[in-house]
Structure formats: structure tokens, C-alpha cells
Amino acid sequence: MGHGSDGGGGQAGTWNVLKRVSSWIDVVTEDELSPGDVHVVDLGGIEVAVFNVAGQYFAIEDVCTHDGSEISTGCLYDHVIECPRHGARFDVRTGEVLEPPAYEPVQTFKVRVENGMIQVGDDQ
């Protein structure tokens, strides 16, 4: 009866875990990051690229999962960044691979704006 059930009709033993951001790192002001631009910041040894896509901000690890090169220097088309080395494409909103030769997504980071300052969440 009460054993092995979560009481909510779902599968036993499955839980939704919310990940909290431990701290926020100031990156750049909104005025300094125009639509279509990117700014790279070191987040505890991880290079993070912050993009302005039509007034919305997104952050991904600045590394192509295909060969480890930086992708922030590639071409940004709307929400898609293309790696300058071999042409892999990633969605900067989700980190999803849109075109090989990469097959693994890039890590994404939470972004917020506080008093005109774009901040990236350090949830490592």
C-alpha cells in the first residue's frame, strides 16, 4: 500500500530536483551587449559566452563539443551559433546540437538582468 509509491500516481522513486544557483556573476551591462553580440567571461575556469539574441540573453560554455575549440567567434544567426572550425551548429537557448559534426550539446547557464547588469548563474 504505502510501499514503493510516491502517493501521487507517478512512478515510485522519481523526484523532480530543482537546482539552485549558488551565486550570480556580473558579466556586462545591457548597454554594452547589443543584439547579435557576444561577450565571453571566465566563470571559475570555464569560459562562458553570453549572447544577445533580439534583446534576450543566453549563455553557453564557449567550447565546441566536437573538437574543444571556442565557438563564440563563429557566426550567430538568430539563436544559432556556428563553430568557425568545422561548422557544427548549436542552439544558444538550449545548447542543443542542430548540425554535426558535433553530437553532444553544449552546457547552458542561467542568465538574469539586475539593475541593467547581465549576470550568469554559477550553478557548478
Explain the meaning of each model-derived region.
Residues 82, 103:
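Short acidic-hydrophobic sequence patches enriched in Asp/Glu that either
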Residues 100:
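Short glycine/proline-centered loop/turn elements that form peptide/ligand docking sites
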Residues 2-6, 13-78, 91-92, 96, ...:
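N-terminal pre-ligand scaffold of iron-sulfur
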Residues 64, 83-86:
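Short cysteine clusters
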